[in-house]
């Protein structure tokens, strides 16, 4: 009845058990936030999120921010870095002002992460970017594909697995630790 994926990564294994109660965990916050978007049961407004995404896609940002000051013309172009930085800050502002809930925040951050991945100037790994890269793609966010019929009791964690394992119970535990 309960499946725990305690090194859940991108959530591929957990998504195969959508008809069960899921417990996901990943120490990487970016993976955890995607798990919240895909697996956590919480009400959200799809129309609101799609409207925000459309607004973000039509943005033109000319002011610098953390992202542009630190990553311009490395993994992303200067323009995309400005846009990414603005969007990320705006998502947090909307969340802190209670304009969006935690599920909506997770949906927006997941959309941003996947849009960034599609245009990143890398060879598939983020340990280095391609020098003198050609930035011919631009940031385009889309609404994440989610299954709205997820179990009401699903739990998503961002904890050290060695500690978490003492606090959960499951009928099946999938363990695929990092091997890099």
Which role does the model predict for each range below?
Residues 21-23, 28-148, 180:
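Class I S-adenosyl-L-methionine-dependent methyltransferase module
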Residues 10-20:
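Conserved SAM-binding loop of SAM-dependent methyltransferases across substrates and taxa
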Residues 163-169:
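Short conserved loop adjoining the S-adenosyl-L-methionine
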